């Protein structure tokens, strides 16, 4: 045995804490928020994360001599305090790109958020951000279509797109489900949507739903002269079943399908995205289960990481929360990961939670979807926050209209167009929101009733997961 080999256990920081290291452009960089066990030095905790998420194990092993460990190991190169948190700290780790399979988000996450999250030396661990190098981005397929192609295909420009989730989301027969879709689309919406948990249940098998939805879309297109769509959820118990459903949607002439990317998994999502690109279909992505992973401020994976991974894995639309609705998410954090979905370059900006510069090159962008507890009074804020390259989805805010879903859809369409017109005229639509909506309501009885119905409805709860920024 080589004389270089010394059996036994040594501290992680002897090998994986490298404060003099300067990251390479080709390195994959990660920022972890670490909370170690009492008495364990920060450097040892951070080095343990670097080791266990790359080449390390608990003991020195002879087979290290068979490879170039210094080339392949992850390196913790910086530690920072977390503002306002004396228990936790940020560990910045650089990983050589050769540790990861090209184009595989599954492989990246298996390393970075694998066994290390169960490590006893850690009380909590959270993956806050990843900087993907351009060499890795170029190996990923990304969105099957992107923002501009979707606009061209749907022939919709100059404003956010408008949609809603069909309610009740479970329990309707296929025919009644199609009836609700028709009412919404003829009322003025661009899209309707399956909810995340409707697949193929006894009360409504997927073929039946797809057929009645297709009929509803064709009728509404004939009546309105506009291109319409419905997110047909093809998420299934096996990939083979998922592709069968996608093929049937294509046969029916539908423009868009849907996938629950976290419960379905990144491998399934990447495969479906490739299928959509090949077959000319748009792909809507729901983030069901995300809050289990991202809501705890000290443990899990931040949603900005999931959003980045989804852009690389592939999707044309992704749910991002609303800021003003019923779901978790403050304004600056939400804007931070919306930038990661849509922009070609996003600079480091701690005020938005972005720990690294991120160059996306020529990869197409993803529509940000605002959905969850929103109604017409929220429209000015939504237009201001999300901008044009977004989908604003009003579920209860459509179906809960006293005159029915068609009237709710009409109210939302009038409110949206009034806000876009006011914005284009240079008005501050958030400050002047009441005047803008009340004026539009004078010419739309549907909007006037909606404004009266939801005038007292607010979701004013403090955000659980807040940005760690210095005051």
Curated annotation (Swiss-Prot):
Family per similarity comment: Belongs to the RuBisCO large chain family. Type I subfamily.
Other remarks in the entry: The basic functional RuBisCO is composed of a large chain homodimer in a 'head-to-tail' conformation. In form I RuBisCO this homodimer is arranged in a barrel-like tetramer with the small subunits forming a tetrameric 'cap' on each end of the 'barrel'.
Enzyme class: lyase
Site (Transition state stabilizer): 326
GO MF annotation list: magnesium ion binding; monooxygenase activity; ribulose-bisphosphate carboxylase activity
Binding site for Mg(2+): 193, 195-196
PANTHER family: RIBULOSE BISPHOSPHATE CARBOXYLASE, RIBULOSE BISPHOSPHATE CARBOXYLASE LARGE CHAIN
Compartments reported by the entry: Carboxysome
Cofactor(s) demanded: Mg(2+)
Superkingdom of the source species: Bacteria
Single Gene Ontology BP annotation: photorespiration
Protein name: Ribulose bisphosphate carboxylase large chain
Signal peptide: none
Reactions that this protein is recorded to catalyse: 2 (2R)-3-phosphoglycerate + 2 H(+) = D-ribulose 1,5-bisphosphate + CO2 + H2O; D-ribulose 1,5-bisphosphate + O2 = 2-phosphoglycolate + (2R)-3-phosphoglycerate + 2 H(+)
Binding residues annotated for substrate, in chain numbering: 115, 165, 169, 287, 319, 371
Keyword match Kinase: no
Function: RuBisCO catalyzes two reactions: the carboxylation of D-ribulose 1,5-bisphosphate, the primary event in carbon dioxide fixation, as well as the oxidative fragmentation of the pentose substrate in the photorespiration process. Both reactions occur simultaneously and in competition at the same active site.
Positions of modified residues (N6-carboxylysine): 193
Active site: 167, 286
InterPro entries named in the record: RuBisCO (IPR033966), RuBisCo_large_chain_AS (IPR020878), RuBisCO_lsu_C (IPR000685), RuBisCO_lsu_C_sf (IPR036376), RuBisCO_lsu_fd_N (IPR017443), RuBisCO_lsu_N_sf (IPR036422), RuBisCO_lsuI (IPR020888)
SUPFAM superfamilies, per the entry: RuBisCo, C-terminal domain, RuBisCO, large subunit, small (N-terminal) domain
Organism: Parasynechococcus marenigrum (strain WH8102)
Induction: Cells grown on urea as a nitrogen source have more activity than those grown on nitrate (at protein level). RuBisCO activity of urea- but not nitrate-grown cells decreases with rising temperature (from 25 to 28 degrees Celsius, present versus predicted future ocean temperatures); there is only one RuBisCO in this cyanobacterium.
Keywords linked to the UniProt accession: Bacterial microcompartment, Calvin cycle, Carbon dioxide fixation, Carboxysome, Lyase, Magnesium, Metal-binding, Monooxygenase, Oxidoreductase, Photorespiration, Photosynthesis
Broad class of the protein's primary localization: other
Subunit structure: Heterohexadecamer of 8 large chains and 8 small chains. Forms a CsoS2-CsoS1-RuBisCO complex.
Cofactor note: Binds 1 Mg(2+) ion per subunit.
